[in-house]
Curated annotation (Swiss-Prot):
It catalyses: a di-trans,poly-cis-dolichyl phosphate + UDP-alpha-D-glucose = a di-trans,poly-cis-dolichyl beta-D-glucosyl phosphate + UDP. It comes from the Eukaryota. Keywords: Endoplasmic reticulum, Glycosyltransferase, Membrane, Signal-anchor, Transferase, Transmembrane, Transmembrane helix. The keyword Transmembrane helix applies. The chain crosses the membrane at residues 2-21. Its EC number is 2.4.1.117. Its main location: endoplasmic reticulum. This is Dolichyl-phosphate beta-glucosyltransferase. The lineage of its organism: Eukaryota, Fungi, Dikarya, Ascomycota, Taphrinomycotina. Residues 22-322 are cytoplasmic. It is a single-pass membrane protein.
Amino acid sequence: MVVYIVLYTCLAGFILLFLVYYYLTHSHCPRKQLEGEETCVFIENGQKKSLTLEKWSTSDNIQITVIVPAYNESKRIGNMLQETVDHLEKYYRSSSSAGQRRWEILIVDDESKDTTVNAVLEFSNKLDLRDHLRVCSLKRNRGKGGAVTWGMLYARGQYAIFADADGASQFSDLELLFKNMPPGPRGGVVVGSRAHMVNTAAVVKRSFIRNFLMHCFHKLLQILGIREIGDTQCGFKLFSREAYQSIFPRMHVEGWIFDIEVLTLARFFGLPIIEVPITWHEVGGSKMTLLKDSISMAIDLLVIRLNYTFGIWERPSAKRIT
């Protein structure tokens, strides 16, 4: 009887390990690009035009690329774009008489069900932004991380930043991030942070359950060894060209927790990561389902840790920068 118990226990353990391994190796495979997703649209002289993008067709004329992931953001994205364009027009136009724009915005529409694309194009037409504001529509939803990753693969700027469509982060704080960008040809990653706001009204007035889950998430990060960054999830991160071209082709996670893999890969590559306090405010209309997405984030966090720890996902070294 004891022998059978031991055998069944070993068999059950083997099956469990196999299922865990299968989940780790198959659950977070980035979705392949679908036909037509590399085509973007923009407005020129009141007419909608299309353009097929090329991955990293870098241009020294573009100093900064702004990636904005968007899902059902027709009501919020206009204000964010106005603030963003106002800042970019002030700081990122050439000093020549023509005043050439040295910036671009790439909206990655993640299969929105509303009129997000039309709202962006109407905004672009009003300000005559032409192909400096382009919209790409994913044929099937990928999640925030997938949308950001997709956009970064087509960035052209010397630097690239992703910013949330709700405008919660003050876009003019981009200059704070630039001031803290590590010097040298490699650059690095500069992370906008809300960690300094933990005891402010913007956070305290949140619901008890939201603050409780936030603290649980931070504790889990500390347990898993991610301690050097106080706010990993703020949607306002700036990358040098070498940083974004090294990190994003190797991404696996496409959900809310993708920031953790971004920072993990940056650390593997030996890229400096600098955290900078920014101005931030709560904006209604969040797309997160609190309990469901919190559980999903915790699972994804463990998946990231286990896959890199056990070598299931390739762990790049600092010497391997491409």
